[in-house]
Amino acid sequence: KEETGYTLTSWRFRGLVTFVTEAENSKTVEYMEYMCLYTADGFTGEPTACDEGELAWVKKEDVLHLNLWEGDKIFFRLLNEDEPFFSLKLRYVGDTLAEAVLNGKQMELFEERSGDGMPTGTIVERGVAHSEGRCHGTAHIWIARANEKSGCEVLLQKRSAWKDSNPGCYDISSAGHLSAGDTYLEGALREIGEELGIHAEAEELKDLGLLEKVSHGVFYGKPFHDHEVSAVYLY
């Protein structure tokens, strides 16, 4: 009420958010804060001048397009998706998001990339990347072998039914997202090892170049905007 002039008449306690900020060149914790997160759908009163900043009504679907901290975008996404009560820990190194933990489980973080595959320096959470269509990196590894009858065979993988994109479809031999800090080659070697148990050496992967792909769809009732720059390899 002090900052907005509104008196709440209906609200929900949605989650706890922990913010931790570390110095850029050390693991020294410079700042730590715990935030109780509420949403309200009932209030009375009139807006008042706010000495903390300027008040403005924003459509829910437009919030993620504002200039927000990357960690803030995570809890706004969770609220928009009506996530049950949650505990979210956000750790920053300087101004850069370094870790996000939801209900004790690490969330996937990507490096945002430009169209040529180079990292921009911004770290983005997987769900935010796919809800906003933020460009990120993936590695595609095609596995081929000689065949006396046809000349060549290519190994395909059938995607699990629980995948968020193209479930149950046949796909590349091995593919996956690059985690924040990965090079394309590091991501490719990790994926082929984790998915297929092939412990390849770097020199065994032939670099075929970069492929940019943009697609839009709906998965599990949620908008899905995918913008990838993929390094393609042949094993």
Question: Where on the chain are the PLM-derived regions?
Answer:
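Small-side-chain secondary-structure face that scaffolds active or pore-lining regions
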Residues: 1-4, 188, 192
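NUDIX/MutT-family hydrolases
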Residues: 37-39, 47-79, 98-106, 232
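Acidic/histidine-enriched, glycine/proline-rich intrinsically disordered or flexible terminal extensions
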Residues: 85-107
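A glycine-rich, hydrophobic loop/mini-helix early in the fold
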Residues: 138-177
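Active-site segment of metal-dependent pyrophosphate-handling enzymes
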Residues: 5-46, 161, 195-235
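Acidic, metal-coordinating catalytic segment for phosphate/diphosphate chemistry
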Residues: 106-149
